[in-house]
Amino acid sequence: MPEWIDRVPYNSGTVDLYAPETAGVYRLIYKSNDDYYVFYVGQSDNLKERLKDHLSPGEPNECIKNHLKNHDCFFRYIEIGTQSERDRIEREEIDHWKPSCNTV
């Protein structure tokens, strides 16, 4: 099983440097005081493109936009090639972290 990458500061420069153009599941994380909280879990067939989409002014999820504006944010990802495996891992991550910006 692939491993989650370590937390990376979330901005367009680090996405360009660290996010691959491959499929996977990702977490968006914010830091408050000395604690870290997952605020969104998603998946994509192109992690770099999707992570950049969230940083764009056109991001439709207001919750994500507010976290990015008001907190120091980070991302982590795991590369997963098959859609069924991405679906499973995304659901497990959402069930585990209960991120505030995911809607059901």
Question: Regions from the language model: what does each represent?
Answer:
Residues 1-53, 80-94:
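GIY-YIG nuclease catalytic motif and its immediate N-terminal context
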Residues 49-71:
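A broadly used, surface-exposed interaction patch
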Residues 68-76, 83:
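Nucleic-acid nuclease catalytic cores
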Residues 96-104:
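Intrinsically disordered, low-complexity regulatory tails
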